[in-house]
């Protein structure tokens, strides 16, 4: 075990400067810690956690000022063999996961006010529907869109609940079946924007249109039509040099006994940018990510959701570091020239609140609880992006401390 001594007793559930009664965690997985450390939990540098995760090194974070037992970090993946020389990996992507038989539900033109997301996912939870991806891009006017995925086995009862929700809230819903979720995984993916760019560019070269996009620190997920799966797997495996043992189709996750929420992190160093009225065709997401990567501009959360519309366009929203926004102006101007009819829209001052827990994928209703906690504080959600172990909500900067305390 590698012991690391700091000025805090270990890893806490959240920032004690915001929540004075934050609790010390006895243990946390490296995967959970990567998600937390990437969004503001500064106890450990993400690169230290990444090396521990890759090589199965146990870390224990302790205080240099007390005898507390601290927090133990352990990796949940098969460790790589240690070799002489650098511990840095030349391959950022270490696996591809394929989840088949997914259905995409899109609720469009619903009200944009606090409590709507809570109402939707509480309703789904009451019907015992387990939701996977949840995506909300930035709102357009006074209404909003929320898109989510479920197993095709739950389509009938999900459609019934969506029908009731549109009666209560207004708007409409759309259903797409025969969809599949693809996810590339690797520590620190979002710190390397070229990785997302390579994924979307690879799918574009295969003439595969991406329907949904959601990201976290260690995973980039997208939803495509099921008939494109064999081609997508072949192209992605070739691009990222993945062997058959690194490709998992419908994997069985063994983390079901883990807590649904382990910790909460806050990142105030983000700005929100939306690309409006983009053409709905292969290669658009790739062109955005490639342009940012080529200019060394880091983006964080990036989401693309579905909207019911007669025009064949889509919106993509992302967050990026505040200091990079001005540098991105020329890049964005060039992009919109190449994508006729599109335009850039800057959002208000925002912050990102991320809830992390390895067990949240198996607990029906976790998302509803998170969104209800924000609604009870009258906090509106600007964007939502999820992975299996992280739910990130973009809120107004003025509400961020209140959101963490919620």
Locations of regions flagged by a protein language model:
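C-terminal catalytic "cap/lid" subdomain
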Residues: 1-386, 390-406
